[in-house]
Structure formats: C-alpha cells, structure tokens
C-alpha cells in the first residue's frame, strides 16, 4: 500500500492545518461506523482517511462567514 505524499495531500486540502482537521474528522467517522471493514485488517483509520483524501474521494466545503 503506497502512502500519499504530504505535498499531494496539502494540494487537495489547501493547507496542512486543514488537512489535519479533515483527516481527523474522516478517521473519527470511520472509527464510529462500519466503513473500515472494507479495508485491509490492521490499517489504521487515519491512514485510510489520508488515502481517501489523496484519491479525491473526500469532498468538503468550508463554511462561509456571515456578514
């Protein structure tokens, strides 16, 4: 299983801070649900989340500021 590069992940998320938040939220979703069952046993949820972000499977939208 090839690990995605940090540069590639940063381009997808916009910044390393946004990447950390996005990966953490997705990893929590995987932990709390049964989605992780489709991945190889022993693969950590954060690794799965980063692979999904690199593959473009995760779509996100930042909230808009209210005037």
UniProtKB/Swiss-Prot annotation:
Keyword Cell wall biogenesis/degradation: no
SUPFAM superfamilies with a match to the protein in the record: RPB6/omega subunit-like
EC number assigned by the record: 2.7.7.6
First-tier enzyme category under EC: transferase
Molecular-function GO terms, alphabetical: DNA binding; DNA-directed RNA polymerase activity
Domain of life from the UniProt record: Bacteria
Gene3D superfamilies for this protein: 3.90.940.10
One of the record's GO cellular component terms: DNA-directed RNA polymerase complex
A Pfam short name: RNA_pol_Rpb6
SMART domains tied to this protein: RNA_pol_Rpb6
GO annotation terms (biological process): DNA-templated transcription
InterPro entries: DNA-dir_RNA_pol_omega, Pol_omega/Rpo6/RPB6, RPB6/omega-like_sf
Function summary: Promotes RNA polymerase assembly. Latches the N- and C-terminal regions of the beta' subunit thereby facilitating its interaction with the beta and alpha subunits.
Alphabetized HAMAP family for the sequence: RNApol_bact_RpoZ (MF_00366)
Subunit structure: The RNAP catalytic core consists of 2 alpha, 1 beta, 1 beta' and 1 omega subunit. When a sigma factor is associated with the core the holoenzyme is formed, which can initiate transcription.
PANTHER family hit by this protein: DNA-DIRECTED RNA POLYMERASE SUBUNIT OMEGA (PTHR34476:SF1)
Family: Belongs to the RNA polymerase subunit omega family.
Protein's recorded name: DNA-directed RNA polymerase subunit omega
Species name: Moorella thermoacetica (strain ATCC 39073 / JCM 9320)
């Amino acid at each position: 299983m090839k690990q995605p590069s940090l540069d590639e992940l940063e381009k997808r998320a916009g910044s390393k801070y946004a990447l950390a938040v996005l990966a953490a939220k997705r990893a929590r979703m995987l932990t709390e649900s049964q989605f992780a069952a489709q991945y190889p046993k022993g693969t950590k949820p954060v690794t799965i989340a980063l692979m999904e972000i690199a593959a473009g499977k995760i779509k996100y939208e930042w909230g808009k500021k209210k005037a």
